[in-house]
Amino acid sequence: MGGAQAPEQVEEETAELKEAIAIGQAEQIEEEMGDLLFSLINYARFLQVDAEQALEKTNKKFMQRF
């Protein structure tokens, strides 16, 4: 998956996850969630964003709120 296609891939994987949720099959939901997470990490890489660092910052914000 190339970087230029990363935004479209995120949208596609999001749609597939929504479909899996609508069907209610746990294994398919897990698979599609994994695909979406991978796509998001690839998109971050394309944007030259450190996905791990971004997640750590968000976790810290979450912990401060609760």
Language-model segments: what does each one mean?
Residues 1-33, 37-66:
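Flexible "arm" and connector segments at domain edges
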